[in-house]
């Protein structure tokens, strides 16, 4: 990992000694800059435009070199608005790629694509920075063991387990619990694995970014009183920003995560919301640079851009980055090049269901639609695999019987099917779980359930040992022993009412 133990402040006098050019052309967020012969900047170098606009306001725009055009000209993409720029303005070549602050100083703070804090909580120590462009770890550095990343969330660990150092796609509409699930994962990795999280808000709504920050403060994921004890760093490049910022903000978040993995040797969770916006921004930049579009108007370099981001997200012998990426599917078309390219990199998918959310079953993870490449006997073991398959079969049979139940009622089913339905309803409720971060809303203390406990619980339900317990005893509990205690309490309450 390349660490620059220097300041990333563009104001330093060192910049004045760098070679300078002049703006020759401005096309929206794209600038053409002329440099003296023999002093051309490299691809991905950061350029800084300084000066004043026509009203006298200070201008400070950072750009990134994308193309060398010949005739001493380069084409660069701006990372912020180009309002007020004029031809002939001086441009300074920093001589290096964009660098952002890394390490513990980033926790509890919100940054933009340039690594500048945007939360009005004062400056950040920038003595340790790292460039956002770097190659993926070499094969020799990779950890080849296939191991499960235990989240403490029953439905995830049992039916669609996450791979340590893997990539997970998170699918779900508005209001089905994506944010709460993300916050619970951030909380659990900090408590159970001693890890930290980095959240990359790529091209989403500013309001959602603000809501997430407020909810994190409310739930304790960000500690306002002692920022250093926070469990997450936030990097935002929202949809009102130029395409250059949206295209690079994912790399800024990833660079911060890589430091925690490579230098601090921690397990890191990297959230990207939304990976589709990363592709969309790349498409906009590609068009502005004059490249010929590919299928459906996307950039011809789509697979390369996606690969350069995704291949850096991996496990090394030092630590791991496990990435959870929200995936927007345009017009619900899974064959669209953007989601199709993303799917090639995913190890698991977590699908949130509006139907389950409507029933009040949270987390509303669809047990039949969610998948994982880790759910194989040689990886998770025979017991886990068999239990997961039997749970899925029971839920699938219940789904098939629902139409018959709706038309004819439960009484028309065979004895065997009625037993299947009863167990499936218990399983469905036992897949719900109280979250630590939702304590402030529900009043129920959160529960972290280990994988062994999860498997034991579902095996007991499937074996029929708990057929006598009421189904509401399984709703919003941690392990199976809590369900048994809840059933006893419910029985006592019903006797008292009588």
Curated annotation (Swiss-Prot):
Record Gene3D superfamilies: 2.40.10.170, Bovine Mitochondrial F1-atpase, Atp Synthase Beta Chain, Chain D, domain 3 (1.10.1140.10), P-loop containing nucleotide triphosphate hydrolases (3.40.50.300)
Matches recorded under InterPro entries: AAA+_ATPase (IPR003593), ATP-synt_VA_C (IPR055190), ATP_synth_F1_bsu (IPR005722), ATPase_a/bsu_AS (IPR020003), ATPase_alpha/beta_chains (IPR050053), ATPase_F1/V1/A1_a/bsu_N (IPR004100), ATPase_F1/V1/A1_a/bsu_N_sf (IPR036121), ATPase_F1/V1/A1_a/bsu_nucl-bd (IPR000194)
EC number: 7.1.2.2
GO BP term, example: proton motive force-driven mitochondrial ATP synthesis
Catalytic activity: ATP + H2O + 4 H(+)(in) = ADP + phosphate + 5 H(+)(out)
Keyword Cell division: no
Subcellular location: Plastid, Chloroplast thylakoid membrane
Family: Belongs to the ATPase alpha/beta chains family.
Subunit structure: F-type ATPases have 2 components, CF(1) - the catalytic core - and CF(0) - the membrane proton channel. CF(1) has five subunits: alpha(3), beta(3), gamma(1), delta(1), epsilon(1). CF(0) has four main subunits: a(1), b(1), b'(1) and c(9-12).
Entry-linked HAMAP family: ATP_synth_beta_bact
Entry protein name: ATP synthase subunit beta, chloroplastic
Organism: Lotus japonicus (Lotus corniculatus var. japonicus)
Species classification: Eukaryota, Viridiplantae, Streptophyta, Embryophyta, Tracheophyta
Gene for this chain: atpB
């Amino acid at each position: 990992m390349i660490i620059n133990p220097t300041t990333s402040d563009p104001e330093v006098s060192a910049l004045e000694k760098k070679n300078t050019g002049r703006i020759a052309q401005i096309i929206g967020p794209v600038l053409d800059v002329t440099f003296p012969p023999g002093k051309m900047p490299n691809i991905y170098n950061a350029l800084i435009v300084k000066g004043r606009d026509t009203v006298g306001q200070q201008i400070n725009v950072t750009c990134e070199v994308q193309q060398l055009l010949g005739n001493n000209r380069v084409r660069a993409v701006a990372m912020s608005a180009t309002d007020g720029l004029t031809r002939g303005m001086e441009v300074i070549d920093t001589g290096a790629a964009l660098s952002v602050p890394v390490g513990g100083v980033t926790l509890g703070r919100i940054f933009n694509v340039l690594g500048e804090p945007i939360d009005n909580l004062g400056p950040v120590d920038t003595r340790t920075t790292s460039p956002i462009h770097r190659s993926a770890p070499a094969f020799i550095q990779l950890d080849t063991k296939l191991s499960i990343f235990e989240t403490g969330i029953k439905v995830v660990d049992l039916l669609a387990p996450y791979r340590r150092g893997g990539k997970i796609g998170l699918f779900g509409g508005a209001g089905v619990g994506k944010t709460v699930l993300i916050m619970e994962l951030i909380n659990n990795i900090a408590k159970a694995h001693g890890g930290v999280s980095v959240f990359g808000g790529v091209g989403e709504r500013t309001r959602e970014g603000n809501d997430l920050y407020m909810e994190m403060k409310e739930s304790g994921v960000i500690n306002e009183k002692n920022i250093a004890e926070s469990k997450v760093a936030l990097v935002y490049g929202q949809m009102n920003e130029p395409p250059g910022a949206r295209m690079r903000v994912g790399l800024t978040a990833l660079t911060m995560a890589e430091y925690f993995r490579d230098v601090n040797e921690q397990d890191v969770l990297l959230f990207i919301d939304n990976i589709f916006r990363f592709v969309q921004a790349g498409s906009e930049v590609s068009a502005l640079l004059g490249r010929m579009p590919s299928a459906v108007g996307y950039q011809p370099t789509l697979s390369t851009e996606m690969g350069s981001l995704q291949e850096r997200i991996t496990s090394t012998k030092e630590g791991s980055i496990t990435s959870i990426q929200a995936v927007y599917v345009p017009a619900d078309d899974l064959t669209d090049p953007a989601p199709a390219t993303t799917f090639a990199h995913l190890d698991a998918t977590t699908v949130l269901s509006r139907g389950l959310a409507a029933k009040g079953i949270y987390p509303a993870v669809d047990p039949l639609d969610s998948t994982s490449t880790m759910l194989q006997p040689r990886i998770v073991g025979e017991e886990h695999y068999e239990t997961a398959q039997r749970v899925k079969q029971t839920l699938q049979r219940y789904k098939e019987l629902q139409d018959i139940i709706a038309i004819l009622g439960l009484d028309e089913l065979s004895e065997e099917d009625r037993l299947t339905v009863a167990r499936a309803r218990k399983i469905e409720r036992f897949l719900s779980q109280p979250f630590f971060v939702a304590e402030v809303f529900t009043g129920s203390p959160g529960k972290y359930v280990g994988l062994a406990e999860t498997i034991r619980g579902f095996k007991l339900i499937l074996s029929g040992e708990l057929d006598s317990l009421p189904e509401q005893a399984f709703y919003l509990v941690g392990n199976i022993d809590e369900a048994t205690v809840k059933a006893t309490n419910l029985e006592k309450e019903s006797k008292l009412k009588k």
